[in-house]
Amino acid sequence: MIDYIKSPVLKFKLIRLLEKNQYTFDVDPKATKTDVKYWVENFFGVKVIGMNSHRPPRKMKRMGPTIGYPVRYKRMIVTLRAGDSIPLF
């Protein structure tokens, strides 16, 4: 079940959210907010107080002579209680 959380996202705009105690993860498209909250709280030992999710727009990719779309994913922004932090970041 931990496969719901694919990877943390470290981009310039999202790094600024770390100052607000918000962490961003790419998750499985089938994952719900409840699933991700459960795994973040149990795996990292923190308290989640808010979550936002969105699906970034798809962009065309050229793969040799063919044009296609990469696999879709969902992105979750997790807000933690003041004083909590995730050691990965």
Curated annotation (Swiss-Prot):
Keywords carried by this UniProt record: Chloroplast, Plastid, Ribonucleoprotein, Ribosomal protein, RNA-binding, rRNA-binding
GO biological process: translation
A Pfam family of this chain: Ribosomal_L23
MF terms (GO), sorted A to Z: rRNA binding; structural constituent of ribosome
Annotated SUPFAM superfamilies: Ribosomal proteins S24e, L23 and L15e (SSF54189)
Location(s) in or outside the cell: Plastid, Chloroplast
Superkingdom of the organism of origin: Eukaryota
InterPro entries (alphabetical): Nucleotide-bd_a/b_plait_sf (IPR012677), Ribosomal_uL23-like (IPR013025), Ribosomal_uL23/eL15/eS24_sf (IPR012678)
Cellular component aspect of the GO annotation: chloroplast; ribonucleoprotein complex; ribosome
Subunit structure: Part of the 50S ribosomal subunit.
Physiological role: Binds to 23S rRNA.
Recorded family membership: Belongs to the universal ribosomal protein uL23 family.
PANTHER family to which the protein is assigned, alphabetical: 60S RIBOSOMAL PROTEIN L23A
Protein name: Large ribosomal subunit protein uL23c
Organism, as annotated: Staurastrum punctulatum (Green alga)
Gene it is expressed from: rpl23
